[in-house]
Curated annotation (Swiss-Prot):
GO terms for molecular function: rRNA binding; structural constituent of ribosome. Residues 1-13, 23-38 have a biased composition (Basic residues). This is Large ribosomal subunit protein uL15. Residues 1-38 are annotated as: Disordered. PROSITE patterns: RIBOSOMAL_L15. One of its GO terms (cellular component) is cytosolic large ribosomal subunit. Binds to the 23S rRNA. The lineage of its organism: Archaea, Methanobacteriati, Methanobacteriota, Methanomada group, Methanococci. Keywords: Ribonucleoprotein, Ribosomal protein, RNA-binding, rRNA-binding. It comes from the Archaea. Part of the 50S ribosomal subunit. Belongs to the universal ribosomal protein uL15 family.
Length: 143
């Protein structure tokens, strides 16, 4: 059986019950406010020392109108797509003709393997994609 009296019971009659001066037990006023309160006022030195980049603006954001966002697909994924929907594509000289813009892609990237000879038409191609398409016996056409 534990016979330990509570802290408050021990401190009865001591006027401040372990909180030091009476003013110190009056809410957040003793701490200068709750949380980040006062960071631009009386706690400014701690901001300068520990988190100087907290206030102010740094760098810049490009205008979204100037950012060219192209829908991309990798060569390996394109071949899988072509093999899955063979009937939808035309043949020309034994090669599958793929117009990437018609299926919703503007740029062809070079990740993956390709073994099907294809004529790929797109707005842009990466260098790796060009090499892989030609190595498989196909050709690329930039629109």
């Amino acid at each position: 059986m534990i016979r330990k009296s509570k802290k408050i019971t021990k401190q009865r009659g001591s006027r401040t019950c372990g909180y030091g001066e009476a003013k110190k037990h009056r809410g957040a006023g003793h701490r200068g406010g709750r949380g980040n309160a006062g960071h631009q006022k009386h706690k400014w030195l701690s901001v300068c020392k520990f988190n100087p980049e907290y206030f102010g603006k740094y760098g810049f954001n490009r205008n979204p109108c100037l950012i060219k966002k192209l829908e991309t697909i990798n060569v390996g994924e394109l071949e899988e797509y072509v093999l899955k929907y063979k009937d939808a594509f035309k043949l020309k000289d034994g090669k599958v003709v793929v117009n990437a813009t018609e299926i919703g892609f503007e740029k062809i990237l070079g990740k993956g393997r390709i073994s099907t000879a294809m004529v790929v038409k797109a707005v842009e191609f990466s260098e790796g994609a060009k090499e892989k398409i030609e190595a498989a016996g196909g050709e690329f056409v930039e629109l």
